[in-house]
Amino acid sequence: MSERKTFFADILLPVPIHQVFTYRIPFELNDQLQFGVRVIVPFGRSKLLTGIVTEIHERVPEAYQAKFIEHVLDEFPIVTAKQFQFWKWISSYYMAPLGDVMNASLPANFKLSSESKVVLHPDFENDQQLDEREQIIVDSLHTNDQMDLKELSAVLGIKTIQPVIKKMIEKRIILSIEALNERFTPKSIVCYTLTDTFADNELLTSFISGLESKASSRKQLEALLTVLSDGKYQGNSMQPVARKELVEKGVSLSALQTLERNGILETQRIEVSRLNAANFELKEKKSLTPAQQKALEEVRECQKTHIVTLLHGVTGSGKTELYVELIEEQLTQGKQVLFLIPEIALTTQLIERLSAYFGEQIGVYHSKFNQNERVEIWNTVLANDPNKFRLIIGARSSVFLPYQELGLIIVDEEHENTFKQMDPSPRYNARDAAIVLGHLHKAKVLLGTATPSIESYTNALDGKYGLVELSERYLGLQMPEIFCANIRTEKKNKSMHSHFSSQLMDGINEALNAGEQVILFQNRRGYTPMWSCEVCAWTPRCKNCDVSMTYHKHTNSLKCHYCGHISAPVGSCGACGSNRLKMVGFGTEKIEDELSLFLPNTVIKRLDLDSTRSKNAYETIIHDFENRQIHILVGTQMITKGLDFDNVGLVGILDADMLLNRPDYRAFERAFQLMVQVAGRAGRKNKKGKVIIQTSNPDQWVLGRVMEHDFKGFYETEIQERKLFFYPPYYKMIHLTLRNTDERKLNAAAQNLTDKLRLVFKERVVGPEFPLIKRIQNFFIKEIKIKIEKDASDRKVKEKIQEMIDLFYAEADNKSSRLSIDVDPY
């Protein structure tokens, strides 16, 4: 009898280490292991982790004795070879541990460890059929609320419990704490139906007769009859009718509310799926205008010779209609399509518009969705189901899905900095990662925007990308007129109304009198960013961070926007005791508050992080603004993305100077993009809109380009500055950030690392220096910046940086300082 061979497997684990780990395969598992399946392995003294098999071989590890693999979780791979190749590129390019990439890629339910905690699923019912082990776990969770897998292993008396837990999660008996803590809110819509009392035909007929006899009740009668005609019946009960559908048909919302108050109608919240679009009625595609048709043909022509094409279309030019045509072509060929958007929470309208064309083929993927939905989409994409989830709409994390037949990637609003992951590692840019993903799959990539990033536009001009310009608004609509209001002059003339220039107030009143709506943009939330003592200039500061506290009136509290620390408002100066404290600056909350004093009969709402803590809150505000129930919408940059309103007569930008004066080489680029994007909300259907920008310096050159809608003029000036001062796209940048709770140790460590880097990179190293905010969450911070020539070998540069980092951490004094690496900071 021949001796059986011993095999080993390299396992990728979700730990922040730059290596895979080799484990021995038990003979009985030899036939079960293959690339891409998950296994349970021991790690450290007592942990059990879920890892991914990346290679099977016969090489015995020399540095340590290989431990045995405990269990195989999958019959088939959950990760593809192309996907793993993509992970390795992310790890290499962004200098991130491969385990961090795995962590970012996989839904939490795929990564159970012995320290994972579980609870009973909210939908679990005690009458479910359970086997003996499942019953013991359920009984234990009834007693303890939540338990980790190590504790449950002890209760069952078995070492490897993950397979049991996996099965119970799939059966919706239990839920991981990671899934529970996602604060997932099911999407719901408000519907109207008859109350039980008025389900009686005789009573209802009598009430309708009463309405018919009163001229003043005409709107109530129309509303009730529409509900009755639209409501489908199952037996004797009427199915609820969506409020949105009723309002779209011209039904008066106030009439519906009156009928509800009087007990004839009642509202119900009906939960609808976020995953598929069965809730939307399919529509015919819109006909393209000649300008759109020409742009579409140019895109197709560019795609013959380029993987990547940049579609530069002005705001309101109808880029979405082009996307629809290109998506349909790919789906018809049996391909998958990825539609990347900057923030899923801000794109309700886009999802609804695409759902109207593609129905159940759409899947929405985002890290805020619950684990069961994310796993469902993952498995469906992996299985390459020909009928479901062929079009994925998602934010950054959707680039990590296991695509099989990817034909097209669309990156909408490609300039947005929210495509860049900041913390934790990997700090990748989803736009750039999508381009690499396109190359791996031989899929076409379309970057769409009204305000291209400097890098993307340069690549297009250099011929690296295809370039298509769409310079006409849809159906010949005119671009808005843009004016600057000189607040320096108005303050001098004492014509300001608090933070509103007379020019802006006149514009607001003019728009409201014409029955139009207004959007006001201020890229700062809260009531006021700072309190200051008039005697000694003291300001209340965060105890954890080197930053002033922001006052929030609705909670009457001071809050740090960096660490979340909250404290009560102060009544006197913390330095000199004076009670002469004044508020300096203004945020969206203060604008809303003060504007309501000037315009008491106007409905004013905010759209910012504080007012949209839940998804439903965001959707309600957008829905109410769409249906003209809100007259003025005050918001941060949330109002610049993915929104399309047809009745906005005026857009006001309250503080352009704050946007332009940030200490960042991208400040002008970001300011131009934000102002052009928010200006694009004005004037959609049959009237030219108006934009008023408040500034102390109306002659500032960027404002001139914004007023003229002149992206090319802006680009030509900005690109010269970048070249002159060695910034991207002419140089690549890598930021190294060190953190330590001890400022003295941080200073020494930062200088040590800088000296090592200068041995290799000479004058290309800038720093070390404190950032604008030198302490966050009790950690002092120092930054080192490296500028590298564009044509330098990327691989060699990063190898040298890593070599210097390894030497740095070989010295004991440096080990207490935390290091993070940001390649291509954005």
Model-derived regions: residue spans:
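Inter-lobe coupling/hinge segments of SF2-like helicase ATPases
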Residues: 283-289, 293-296, 304-747, 755, ...
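Accessory, non-ATPase domains that flank or precede helicase/AAA+ motor cores in DNA-metabolism machines
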Residues: 1-449, 463-477, 760, 794-802, ...
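Short glycine/serine/proline-enriched coil/turn segments at secondary-structure junctions
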Residues: 31, 400, 642, 775-776
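Generic solvent-exposed, charged/amphipathic alpha-helical segments
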Residues: 88-91, 153, 505, 592, ...
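A general secondary-structure signal for short beta-strands and their flanking turns/coil
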Residues: 4-6, 18, 187, 618, ...
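C-terminal accessory/connector segments of nucleic-acid motor ATPases
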Residues: 96, 108-122, 134-139, 145-151, ...
